């Protein structure tokens, strides 16, 4: 068995704010939202079976890169010479040079660490979006993650404690019984998922079991239901649905899952969680959304875009996504993957061989119904006049991308409701 590579530690050279959030395990859930969730047993966030859904919807897989991923290293604007003036030691070289970017379209290139992603890109099932992000100007991890996941940038602290994914799920009928609509492969529920029933937050499927000896399981289940039948909602309803959800997950048989089509997931937490997601999708038990967090993208010092910290993290990201795409095969036609981060990095490198908090970044969108093989961008330029404050401007709001996916692929009746009145401008990222 391969030894699992631990990729979950704090980023070397990350800022004090990010390290504090990492130590607390902050994943975007505000105190009041977390308090509401804690009213249910820690392993129960299910709902009673409800209406049947439309099985034509895509499964949404959200990969959140916490800490602020450097989009200028991932998708390199090598055609903009100002990049090399701003980053004389950190910029990925142009295509054709040693350790150079892999050409995508004559202007943008892919980090060599992400080379596996050329397969879905060339197949027309992966697109990149550059100079995108949230218009929240704070550049604080805490603020940026909150506003991005609640989809409330520039609205201030309104007390909204639901996330854009949770609000989406609350506006559409469940697929199947609605017991297991969404999962966050994490000990804590990401704010983006808050606001819908049938959503679990578990680090591993092995964490969601009914413990004890098989010989006494029937009796223990009976006593468990009797105990919670005397309580109030939401405990009563959560307990009633928890056991069917345990049985539903047990039917997937994660322990014996074998990837298809020669796919090989990286031996990391990310690779493991992608494997769980693929197994659940193939089991067709009603999953609508999976959320995966990858921490430690805050690269203030010793960034290492070619051989160091960032290159290692990008390699894990690229290998995992390619394996997931390959493993799903034709099932990728009913899946859309979105990769996002709270902000990008400042254009100019700092004196610690790293980059500081910036604004515009990049997103990845992958799936069988993605208009891939392209970089979607309204490129503003990296010269000092175009930058203004030294950060890459946001020319495509991240909600434009998400709203298009929700309406085109997930049958959202109104993205404006999910995004609280925001009127998106579609970028033709999906068919």
Regions found by a protein language model. Give the residues of each.
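Feature for exported/extracytoplasmic and membrane-associated proteins, marking the mature portion
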Residues: 2-327, 348, 362-431
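Metal-dependent active-site segment of extracytoplasmic phospho-/sulfohydrolases and closely related
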Residues: 321, 325-352
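Short Gly/Pro-enriched turn/cap motifs at secondary-structure boundaries
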Residues: 353-354, 396
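Conserved active-site-proximal phosphate/metal-binding subdomains
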Residues: 358
């Amino acid at each position: 068995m391969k030894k699992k590579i631990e990729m979950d530690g704090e980023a070397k050279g990350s800022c004090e704010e990010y390290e504090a959030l990492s130590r607390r395990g902050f994943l975007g859930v505000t105190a009041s939202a977390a308090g509401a969730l804690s009213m249910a047993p820690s392993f129960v966030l299910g709902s009673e079976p409800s209406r049947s859904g439309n099985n034509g919807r895509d499964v949404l897989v959200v990969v959140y890169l916490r800490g602020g991923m450097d989009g200028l290293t991932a998708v390199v604007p090598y055609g903009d010479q100002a990049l090399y003036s701003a980053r004389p030691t950190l910029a990925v070289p142009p295509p054709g040079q040693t350790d150079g970017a892999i050409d995508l379209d004559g202007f943008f290139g892919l980090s060599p660490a992400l080379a596996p992603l050329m397969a879905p890109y060339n197949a027309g099932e992966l697109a990149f979006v550059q100079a995108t992000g949230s218009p929240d100007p704070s550049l604080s991890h805490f603020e940026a993650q909150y506003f991005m996941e609640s989809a409330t940038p520039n609205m201030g602290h309104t007390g909204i404690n639901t996330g854009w994914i949770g609000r989406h799920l609350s506006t559409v009928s469940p697929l199947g019984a609605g017991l297991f609509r969404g999962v966050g492969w994490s000990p804590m529920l990401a704010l983006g998922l808050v606001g819908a029933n049938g959503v679990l937050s578990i680090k591993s499927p092995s964490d969601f079991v009914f413990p004890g000896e098989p010989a006494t399981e029937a009796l223990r289940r009976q006593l468990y239901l009797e105990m919670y039948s005397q309580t109030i909602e939401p405990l009563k309803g959560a307990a009633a649905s928890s056991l069917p959800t345990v049985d539903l997950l047990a039917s997937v048989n994660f322990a014996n899952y074998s990837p298809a089509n020669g796919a090989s997931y990286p031996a990391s937490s990310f690779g493991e969680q992608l494997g769980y997601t693929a197994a659940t999708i193939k089991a067709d038990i009603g999953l609508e959304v999976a959320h995966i967090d990858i921490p430690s993208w805050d690269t203030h010092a010793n960034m290492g875009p070619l051989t160091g910290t960032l290159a290692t993290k990008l390699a894990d990201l690229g290998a995992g996504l390619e394996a997931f795409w390959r493993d799903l095969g034709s099932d990728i036609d009913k899946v859309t993957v979105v990769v996002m981060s709270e902000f990008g990095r400042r254009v100019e490198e700092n004196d610690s061989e790293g980059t500081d908090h910036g604004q515009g970044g990049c997103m990845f969108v992958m799936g069988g119904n993605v208009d891939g093989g392209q970089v979607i961008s309204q490129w503003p330029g990296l010269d000092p006049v175009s930058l203004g404050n030294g950060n890459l401007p946001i020319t495509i709001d991240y909600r434009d991308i998400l709203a298009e996916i929700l309406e085109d692929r997930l049958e959202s009746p109104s993205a404006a409701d999910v995004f609280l009145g925001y009127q998106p401008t579609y970028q033709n990222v999906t068919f």
